[in-house]
């Protein structure tokens, strides 16, 4: 039977290859994902290892609670006098202090250098070629007072040379510094699109407004002193606001901030690999079902000469195993190219990822191969069991077909039950309280899987009415070819449904994503119109997300025509045992914002004073707060104060710029080291005019890292990140569409084989080659339209269910995009039919009539 299985594969090379493509693409996605994320992980580890390689211990500011690196809060700085104390310890060989922050480089055109949303990293360098310096000098020399070294990527892209001056802006106005050298970060070729700027310590302290302060002290031990001994000795001289870790511990903590991102990215991309394999399973099952139906007499003959049902099953599963192994190996090879493509994809949309070379681990190989082989075998089980039911007498019968299963009558109620259970599981994941993230994702994935399987099975009952409706134009305009095409799609409803289901899944997910994006955009526009109805302009960072120095708003306030500047500061705080993103506003914010108050009014924003706060309704309910209630809030540097509630507001559907607790900016500045604005909003006399815009632009000419935006520009720039994410999702989902495309091609090729005599008879009674091509093309388009219609409808239902759970998105139906998806489904059908239609048209009439 092994020989029979291998001959079966070799005798159907084209059909096997088309079926294998589905597995190749899915395995490539799984392997490429692991290679991408393992490469990123390796790059980050290289970065953190290079940073700490010359150190045995690291001293840093101590926070009262763990803070997020991207939440606007920082650890308290160290006094520079601590460095001398550390150097004086007997166990210390050397120690160097450093400061760091966001340092915006300015191009030759006077505009900020921004690569997508990547940060602009700036830091002091420990005496050039010191053991504590993680940078490698590519060209030039290390910086002295008034110098800067910048990364080679920026030099190459922006055409800078050593000796030229470049603008650098940190906490104050931009400064002109001489480029003394070009550097790279250790062994990493790119650190994710970020720009690097290195300075000597005095220059960095001036730029970051940290005179007399340090962010870190790197310490090296004398020979014979262990890391733990060194840490113990250092701890004795530290103030309460400082902490010390071994270099290995610090590197591990630094890496922990990226581990969450890498885990999320891996899960995110693997989901699309799983989708591609899931769609591929439909292609495999459908292809094998068709080929097994075509081989009915072959299997019957084998049964006649003594083959048992078990041997038939074994033969087919061996075919599936060989195909799965070969396709998975090819997919693994394609995964290398796909991982490079994923790097390029993220780079193209502004999310450049760190890279130190591709990494292929044994785990990635095993998981990718196992996934491909397992999916192939599971998808082959049902067709294989069907083949075992072929009776020996079928060998002598013309046109023998496979007998129906004893359980065929359960197909309809089973599919309805499966779909219903899927919606129950999905609803449970969305609406059940207290679910962990893992439980939520498991229930959501299980629910989606059951829904797709259930609807795919139900589609068999929907094919006839849908083909009648969607095939009407073909029947009316396509003549006999169109009528035959519609009838052919209705002839074997199970086959048509299975083929359409592959496209349905991809389009359902595309529709779901588009629906969510449309809802987010629509809701965000509504929030801006409702909350910031009085603002004429917004001031933000060039990358739209980073905080901006307070000096930017101060400069804008001095521009002619400015009536008010409302600021929003942001960072982390802790109260009632929970850490949250807190905010602060200045009195002018009362003229900018219009909130929906449960208790209080917009005037509260100007009356907060030293101990006032307003809170959102959810926070108030969680902690039983009302007007006058106390909130004891702790800040990252350990300072704390008690605030009294002066107002309670209801956040709009699309979210709010304010955190659970908002206090006055002056009070905020007392409790936070180096505060910054998240946004600033400007009211100008005369509103939006060219003169007012020019006045603001002129006022901010010394702050290139900030930009002036109108209301619509602000909205467009804030949602630009969403557009980038959406583009990534579309590209990744296109993989499942591509799998379904090959599924349609494969089905059409197989049906052409199956209907060879039929096509020969049609040609014999006068059908032209052109009409044959048209018939196959119409059949492909009708099948694609069925998949498209079911997919779009299912995507709308799933999207509506998800939006009903998410309280910050309004349901919005993106009609234009849905029409585009419907047209795309038709296009897929047209393109998929090209090869099978030509193959059918080229059949020799006499040979076709004699075909068995």
Predicted feature residues:
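Membrane transport/envelope proteins' first extracytoplasmic loop
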Residues: 2, 6, 11-19, 23-278, ...
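Hydrophobic alpha-helical bundles that form the membrane domains of multi-pass transporters
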Residues: 3-8, 12-29, 37, 163, ...
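Alpha-helical transmembrane segments, especially those used as permease/efflux helices
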Residues: 11-18, 264-267, 363, 367-380, ...
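Alpha-helical transmembrane segments
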Residues: 27-58, 289, 338-347, 423-425, ...
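Small-residue-rich transmembrane alpha-helices
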Residues: 288, 322-352, 364-389, 418-433, ...
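Membrane-water interface of transmembrane alpha-helices in multipass transporters/channels
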Residues: 355-363, 428-447, 520, 727-731, ...
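Juxtamembrane segments of multi-pass membrane proteins
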Residues: 449, 454-455, 461-609, 614-617, ...
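C-terminal transmembrane helical bundles of large multi-pass transporters
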Residues: 496, 500, 567, 677-827, ...
